[in-house]
Swiss-Prot record:
EC number(s) recorded for this UniProt protein: 3.6.4.13
Modified residues (Phosphoserine): 84, 843
Single GO molecular function: 3'-5' RNA helicase activity
GO biological process: exonucleolytic trimming to generate mature 3'-end of 5.8S rRNA from tricistronic rRNA transcript (SSU-rRNA, 5.8S rRNA, LSU-rRNA); maturation of 5.8S rRNA; mRNA processing; nuclear mRNA surveillance; nuclear mRNA surveillance of mRNA 3'-end processing; nuclear polyadenylation-dependent mRNA catabolic process; nuclear polyadenylation-dependent rRNA catabolic process; poly(A)-dependent snoRNA 3'-end processing
Protein name: ATP-dependent RNA helicase DOB1
UniProtKB keywords: ATP-binding, Helicase, Hydrolase, Nucleotide-binding, Nucleus, Phosphoprotein, rRNA processing
Species in which this protein is naturally found: Saccharomyces cerevisiae (strain ATCC 204508 / S288c)
Assembly behavior: Component of the TRAMP complex (also called TRF4 complex) composed of at least HUL4, MTR4, PAP2/TRF4 and either AIR1 or AIR2.
UniProt record similarity statement: Belongs to the helicase family. SKI2 subfamily.
Gene Ontology cellular component annotations, sorted alphabetically: nucleolus; nucleus; TRAMP complex
Length: 1073
């Protein structure tokens, strides 16, 4: 690559080709003969010495890189916030009786309802910027006019673009953000400049391309799968493609005036969010931006970051405007009622909410406060699935919506399988006329005609048409891409009246419905079932209400378990999710940044939003530190030395007593004393003190979800205990037996609150002390009235022992005679003696002086902690991780100790669709040399497939051997990572390259039909196509790699792999193109 292709500060670092024995540079490297750098030859002291030298070298480079950074930004930009204003706008809409056939709001005399919304503006400016308030800006020669009156937020945002200043538009789905993006495109094309429109996913890029092509004509598309008209004035692309263009110094960037980032809140995505951050940092300062986002509460923080790193103004235009107001309803599971809980004015209807909760209470059990009640007929209903009567409830809701003419409806479910099951449940209903069926079938057949004949008979295609003809659709990631697209088109054209969809349908083009239904408001996030967050709920519910068509959008939440009012409010009325950085270092990123002059990995870290968010908190912490110091200086303690000594001894005794408690409650010592009726003092998590309770029973802890789960000794048993002091903030569903985690809303009662008697499950580490008394315990504590009898006994015992219930002596009663334990007890005795000799022990002022000193001591500790936080925030975050990753790259031979990139590093720079380290090692080890193209494709599928599926059958030798060789190299890389102090579990790293589809890919490359390979796996058809598309991307990158290292045989092999993969349904294009 010629350095003249690079823009601004980018200049490629020259890289020496390897020399042969005659000292001549060898351009055609035989990768099979390249020395293996994966063996780390240094051990013990030599390795420590190497690490020490690397750190010294690293520190010098950081200083050097800092000076480069400072040269580029001679003045650190401290953004100035200005031009803050808020506009209140109101409008009148027709009154609506909604689903409950009753007036929901106060109606004006003219029969209208008045609704209001806000538009807020603020701008982050570089210091001394010559700024004119946005309200004073007059658009003279507008790039684009509109046949309708712009909403206030659109008008403000367009004024920002008109005068060439970046803007973040934060607004709800369907609010009209696209109008702002279109103005930026129109202005760029008018000025003969180029504009880039980025989107988070390829499917959305394809849809956006089609939309913008119809609007502007001069539009191109670049997604990795396809390139159309790359010389167009407006280019639509994925963010990954833009990042790749920036790293390669594409000539296109010289002509770009504006970059539009759609769905920029994607930046918080753990996996891909870093791509947005990298791209924004790498873009030249001369470029201006339009950021389109869902509502985010910390938008100004983002604007300040843009202003700081690019030395330009960045406006924030926020609105809570919804073109179609929403009504939010609760539908309790297995019930008949529906309850309006949030009206068009966003008022939470507490009374209706409580009615809905009471309705659930009647379904779950007789006693809403009971922790041991069971569902009727022994059934417990849990959110997140379409089991039990949930399908019947959906049937009921959809029929009601159809009857009241509130269709089309999107039914959101968090499971692909549930979407299909629920849709099949509706298959008896028919929402389409004969004319609609005929038109729909024609559109469907025209789309499917693009596929080869053999693929038109796929089960997924054949089975879905009868549903579609009835006006019922399904949309999830497991569908074939062509089916997803035809369903989107049918939905937009009004042929589908009910669409069952997963969460992914809430991302992308404007495809609203009149009604949105949530089959559950709990979801599995990969680790646990949790309530849907406010941001997730806003994003999905925002699909309700079609602008210009509906007077109201309807949102219905099906709930089958108790929900606290604050949870419901947080979901439907709460703040959207914050935009927090998900920045993390990757090897490809580090190597690409090493490759160009004038920029470095340290530069990326310093300019990341992640770093900015840490540093921005420093002034607040410094203010807090000053307040703490003032409080600290204001406390004077008389006789401070003696008070200090008393405090230190008491804290030491407290620590030793905790050690004693750990020994006493260890299963080996405690279990034999935990007979039914034994009194135990309970403190859950060290803070929730339930006081004294009576043991019911105990059992070994078993995790049915994860049988291999490992617990500490204290966590390995569950003890069921009767307590008198439980308080429930709101009705909570039953506690499962042997579940040590108490649900939200359950806590000890505070003074004045009415507590209840209940059985709670705890672990041994929640036992504060074991009493010397036992109560009578009934055989069946859950029988009617038995808990209350034990509770009464507990109250009586507490009354009889006002000075405290006697506890078991660890030595005399429990016979703990371990030598170390006896020494521990002796230490406590010695300290108690020392404490009694302190001059203040019998002083009347002890309590007062001790309280003052404790407060002063706590302030001192808080100050120390805050100083450490300030220091950590001001330091460059993730710098240690960068050092460790560079060490890995050096030991693998990807770069020199001076950060000069080697040939291996150049290869890794080209790979972003798979693990760059392992793939590079496979290439340089010659692992592909002896493989046939179909074997190579099968091996590469391990990098392209990321989903879970059932275990694949035993692999054929021609596949098992390449897999074994790859895993051996992966294990070596993992060892080098561990030796370089990177947290990695070798087994997890090796097994992250999933082999389950190796045989599927192998047979596909040998000519099997798609129908045949679908029968070989339980993976959804759409997931298979997605894997093949990823595989194609990866193979294309390896073709580029072969060119980079001049390996013609590898290039020919990878080109052959591409031909084998790219056929039939895998090669089918998008309907949007």
């Amino acid at each position: 690559m010629d350095s003249t292709d690079l823009f601004d500060v980018f200049e490629e670092t020259p890289v020496e080709l390897p020399t042969d024995s005659n000292g001549e540079k060898n351009a055609d490297t035989n990768v099979g003969d390249t020395p293996d750098h994966t063996q780390d030859k240094k051990h013990g002291l030599e390795e420590e010495k190497e690490e020490h030298e690397e750190n010294n070298s690293e520190n010098k480079k950081i200083k050097s890189n800092k000076s480069k950074t400072e040269d580029k930004n001679k003045k650190v930009v401290v953004p100035v916030l200005a031009d803050s204003f808020e506009q209140e706008a109101s409008r009148e809409v027709d009154a609506s009786k909604g689903l409950t056939n009753s007036e929901t709001l106060q109606v004006e005399q003219d029969g209208k309802v008045r609704l209001s919304h806000q538009v807020r503006h603020q701008v982050a400016l570089p210091p001394n910027y010559d700024y004119t308030p946005i309200a004073e800006h007059k658009r003279v020669n507008e790039a684009r006019t509109y046949p309708f009156t712009l909403d206030p937020f659109q008008d403000t945002a367009i004024s920002c673009i008109d005068r060439g200043e970046s803007v973040l538009v934060s607004a709800h789905t369907s609010a009209g953000k696209t109008v702002v993006a279109e103005y930026a495109i129109a202005q760029s094309l008018k000025n003969k400049q180029r504009v880039i429109y980025t989107s988070p996913i390829k499917a959305l890029s394809n849809q956006k391309y089609r939309e913008l092509l119809a609007e502007f004509g001069d539009v191109g598309l670049m997604t990795g799968d396809i390139t159309i008209n790359p010389d167009a004035g407006c280019l639509v692309m994925t963010t990954e493609i833009l990042r790749s263009m920036l790293y390669r110094g594409s000539e296109v960037m010289r002509e770009v005036a504006w970059v539009i980032f759609d769905e920029v809140h994607y930046m918080r995505d753990k996996e891909r969010g870093v791509v947005w951050e990298e791209t924004i940092i790498l873009l030249p300062d001369k470029v201006r931006y339009v950021f389109l986002s869902a509502t985010i509460p910390n938008a100004m923080e983002f604007a300040e970051w843009i202003c700081k790193i690019h030395s330009q103004p960045c406006h924030i235009v926020y609105t809570n405007f919804r073109p179609t107001p929403l009504q939010h309803y609760l539908f309790p599971a297995h019930g008949d009622g529906i309850y309006l809980v949030v009206d068009e004015k966003s008022t939470f209807r507490e009374e209706n909410f409580q009615k809905a909760m009471a309705s659930i209470s009647n379904q779950i059990g007789d006693d809403p406060n009971s922790t041991d009640s069971r569902g009727k007929k022994g059934q417990t209903y849990k959110g997140g699935s379409a089991k039990g009567d949930a399908k019947g409830d959906i049937y009921k809701i959809v029929k009601m919506i159809w009857k009241k003419k509130y269709n089309p409806v999107i039914v959101f479910s968090f499971s692909k399988r549930d979407c299909e099951e629920l849709a099949l449940k509706m298959s008896k209903l028919d929402f389409n006329s004969d004319d609609e069926k005929e038109a729909l079938t024609k559109i469907f057949n025209n789309a499917i005609a693009l596929l080869p004949e053999t693929d038109r008979e796929l089960p997924q295609i054949k089975h879905i048409l009868p549903l579609l003809r009835r006006g019922i659709g399904i949309h999830h990631s497991g569908l074939l891409p062509i089916l997803k697209e035809v369903i989107e088109i049918l939905f937009q054209e009004g042929f589908l009246k009910v669409l069952f969809a997963t969460e992914t349908f809430s991302i992308g083009l404007n495809m609203p419905a009149k009604t949105v239904v949530f089959t559950s408001v709990r979801k599995w996030d990969g680790q646990q079932f949790r309530w849907v967050s406010g941001g997730e709920y806003i994003q999905m519910s925002g699909r309700a209400g079609r602008r210009g068509l509906d007077d109201r959008g309807i949102v219905i939440m099906m709930i089958d378990e108790k929900m606290e009012p604050q949870v419901a409010k947080g979901m439907v009325k709460g703040q959207a999710d914050r935009l927090d950085s998900a920045f993390h270092l990757g090897y490809n990123m580090i190597l690409n940044l090493m490759r160009v002059e004038g920029i470095s990995p340290e530069f990326m870290l310093e300019h990341s939003f992640f770093q900015f968010q840490n540093v921005i908190s420093v002034p607040v912490m410094e203010k807090k530190l000053a307040e703490l110091k003032k409080d600290f200086d204001g406390i004077e303690v008389e006789d401070e030395e003696n008070v200090k000594e008393y405090h230190e001894i008491e804290q030491a005794i407290k620590g030793y007593r905790e050690d004693v408690r750990q020994v006493v409650t260890h299963p080996a010592n405690a279990l034999s004393f935990l007979q039914p009726g034994r009194l135990v003092e309970i403190s859950v998590n060290g803070k929730d003190n339930y006081g004294w309770g009576a043991v019911v029973d105990f059992a070994k802890r078993i995790n049915k979800r994860n049988p291999s789960a490992v617990y500490t000794d204290h966590e390995s048993y569950i003890v069921n205990v009767v307590v008198n002091t439980m308080y429930i903030d709101s009705p909570v569903n039953l506690l499962k037996p042997f579940n040590p985690t108490l649900p939200e809303g359950i806590r000890p009662a505070e003074e004045g609150e009415k507590s209840i008697c209940a059985v709670i499950p705890i672990t041994l580490d929640s036992i504060k002390s074991i009493g010397n008394l036992r109560l009578y315990m009934p055989k069946d504590i859950r029988a009617s009235g038995q808990k209350e009898t034990v509770g009464k006994s507990l109250r009586e015992v507490n009354r009889r022992f006002p000075d405290g219930i006697p506890v078991l002596d660890p030595v005399k009663n429990m016979k703990i005679e371990d030598e170390d334990f006896l020494k521990l007890m002796k230490k406590i005795d010695v300290l108690n003696t020392k404490l009694s000799s302190n001059p203040l022990t019998n002083s009347m002022r002890l309590e007062e002086l001790y309280g003052k000193y404790s407060r002063k001591h706590d302030l001192h500790e808080d100050m120390k902690q805050l100083k450490r936080k300030i220091s950590e925030s001001q330091a460059v975050i993730q710098l240690d991780d960068l050092r460790r990753r560079k060490r890995v790259l050096r030991r693998l031979g990807f770069c020199t100790p001076n950060d000069i990139i080697e040939l291996k590093g150049r290869v890794a720079c080209e790979i972003s669709s798979g693990d760059e380290l392992l793939l590079t090692e496979l290439i340089f080890n010659g692992n592909f040399n002896e493989l046939k193209p179909e074997q190579a494709a099968a091996l590469l599928s391990c990098f392209a497939f990321q989903e879970r599926c059932k275990e694949a059958p035993r692999l054929k030798p021609e596949l098992a051997e390449p897999l074994k060789a790859m895993r051996e190299i992966a294990a070596k890389i993992a060892k080098i990572m561990k030796d370089s102090k990177i947290e990695v579990v070798e087994k997890d790293y090796v097994e992250s390259f999933r082999h389950e589809l190796m045989e599927v890919v192998y047979e596909w490359c040998r000519g099997a039909t798609f129908t045949q390979i679908c029968k070989m796996t339980d993976v959804y058809e759409g997931s298979l196509i997605r894997m093949f598309k990823r595989l194609e991307e990866l193979v294309k990158e390896l073709v580029d790699v072969a060119n980079t290292i001049g390996n013609s045989s590898l290039k020919e092999k990878m080109e052959a792999v591409l031909k084998l993969i790219h056929r039939d349904i895998v090669s089918a294009g998008s309907l949007y193109l």
